[in-house]
Amino acid sequence: MKATLIFFLLAQVSWAGPFEQRGLFDFMLEDEASGIIPYDPDNPLISMCPYRCQCHLRVVQCSDLGLDKVPWDFPPDTTLLDLQNNKITEIKEGAFKNLKDLHTLILVNNKISKISPEAFKPLVKLERLYLSKNQLKELPEKMPRTLQELRVHENEITKLRKSDFNGLNNVLVIELGGNPLKNSGIENGAFQGLKSLSYIRISDTNITAIPQGLPTSLTEVHLDGNKITKVDAPSLKGLINLSKLGLSFNSITVMENGSLANVPHLRELHLDNNKLLRVPAGLAQHKYIQVVYLHNNNISAVGQNDFCRAGHPSRKASYSAVSLYGNPVRYWEIFPNTFRCVYVRSAIQLGNYK
């Protein structure tokens, strides 16, 4: 009996053919059946896929193929289209016709310098548009109103027009870093149409001041690696929902009195690698701030009430991280009670000045 059972199992193994990987998506299995979609003569749409691209589960991958133009024969039910790392120079009208179900379009790292104003018109459900690392000098016109995420960092954008974001009420995230943008190139009211914006990054540009008119809905603003020299109170006015402000690697010498009062819900303030001469005023009165990065500045003294309110602490939250290393002030010159409202001493990083 045992010999018969072993023979039966061996026979089953011998009938099974070797595994043959047919494509990148072999491991992306459907909920039912295998990961390979069989040809169905009654439904020719299943077999439609641009030459050399890979199509699976409404995802079309045409990346890293050296393409110089957008292919034309996409399955009409495509929801994600990946065209990154090619040599596409232009997006023409009709390039995405019939892709009414497309949610994500990835065009990163091409050579795109021109986009037709009608190119995105068919994309009535588009939520994510990735155009980073191209040669765009301005933002595309008539972007879909369904858009939630726009990434255009590392292009050649020099101006933001008021019309660029008109009607984009659903956008939550914008990435604009790595463009040769200046304050003079940002039109008054440029951000006015962004009613739901939560996150914006304008880092590594040529701006010298915090852009005016940022949406009040913002919770994170990242302006690292620019040429900002000071933070004045009006530049933060209205940002009542802001919880994180990144200003690292600028040339800031002062944060004006009253600036922090305009961001009452701020929890993280990154001011490291600037030229600050003193600790920003208003930290002690701020109820919610927990993280303050001030390392690698020119701070030569720290007052006893710079971080904690005089007398009994009235803060809602304790500091979880305060960095002061890389400043001229010596740690032994700082009074022990300076951080009396910090309950975990390991949160304080002093270090030495080089």
Swiss-Prot record:
Chain positions listed as propeptide in the UniProt record: 17-30
Highest taxon listed in the record's lineage: Eukaryota
SMART domains: LRR_BAC, LRR_TYP, LRRNT
LRR repeats: 68-88, 89-112, 113-136, 137-157, 158-181, 182-207, 208-228, 229-252, 253-276, 277-299, 300-329, 330-354
Entries under InterPro entries matching the protein: Leu-rich_rpt, Leu-rich_rpt_typical-subtyp, LRR_dom_sf, LRRNT, SLRP, SLRP_I_decor/aspor/byglycan
PTM summary: The attached glycosaminoglycan chain can be either chondroitin sulfate or dermatan sulfate depending upon the tissue of origin.
Signal peptide: 1-16
UniProt family annotation: Belongs to the small leucine-rich proteoglycan (SLRP) family. SLRP class I subfamily.
The name this protein goes by in its record: Decorin
